[in-house]
Amino acid sequence: MSCQSPIVVALDYPTMAQSIEMAKRLDPEQCRVKVGKELFTTAGPVILDELHKLGFEIFLDLKFHDIPNTVANAVCVAAKAGVWMVNVHASGGRRMMEASANALQKLPDNKTLLIAVTVLTSMDQSDLIEIGIDATPEQHVKRLAALAKSSGMDGVVCSAQESSMLSAELGKDFVLVTPGIRPAGSDQGDQKRIMTPVEAMAAGSHYLVMGRPITQANDPIAVLTQANADLGLMA
C-alpha cells in the first residue's frame, strides 16, 4: 500500500547497519525514506533492496549533475531499481534535464518521480554571490524552477519559504519537495531556511523531508506519529 503521509525521513547515516536499524523503528505506512550520498556511497545499491524489503518507498537523493547522457543513464538505473523519487541539479541545464525526463518516459510503466534541485537550503545570498550569481535565493529558485518545469521535471526541491510562490506560478500539480522541516522548537542545525510541517504544507509543499528531529529522537516513531497527527493524518 502506498504511503499516504507527506513525510520523508532522511536516513543520513554512515553505515547500512545504522540506517536499517532506524528504518526498523519507523513505519512505511507513516513515512517514506531518503537515501543520500553518504549512505549510498558506503552501502551501494543493496541499501535500496533492503529498504524495499521493509516496505519503504525511497527517495534517492544523489543530486545528479553531469553531461546529459550520463545523467539520463543514471536516473534510468535508479528507476529500474524501483525508487519512488530521484533528483538532479537544475543548474545542470535544460539539455541535461530534458535528456533525463525523456529517458524515463521511454521506460515501460515508469512511476519514478524526477525532481530538480534548485538552491540548497543551506545557502543564502552571500553564498550565491560567491559563486557568481547576483540574485537572492528566492529569485534564483524561481528561475531554476521555471526552467525545470519547462524541461519536463515532475517538480523541484525548494525551501518552504518558496513553496507558496512556486505553487502559484507553476501550478499546484508541480511537485514541491521541502527539506529543512523541523517541529516547532527544534534546533535549526545547518539549514538556513526552515519551517514546521504544518507551515510547509500550508505554504504549498507536497513532500516534507525530516532528518535529525526524528532520527535523533529518543522515540522516533512517536515524533513521526505526532508530526502526522499535526497534519491531520493517522491521529
Swiss-Prot record:
Subunit and interaction comment: Homodimer.
Assigned protein family: Belongs to the OMP decarboxylase family. Type 1 subfamily.
Regions crossing the membrane: none
Function statement: Catalyzes the decarboxylation of orotidine 5'-monophosphate (OMP) to uridine 5'-monophosphate (UMP).
GO cellular component annotations of the record: cytosol
Organism for this UniProt entry: Marinomonas sp. (strain MWYL1)
Record's protein name: Orotidine 5'-phosphate decarboxylase
Keyword Transmembrane helix (UniProt): no
Pathway membership, UniProt: Pyrimidine metabolism; UMP biosynthesis via de novo pathway; UMP from orotate: step 2/2
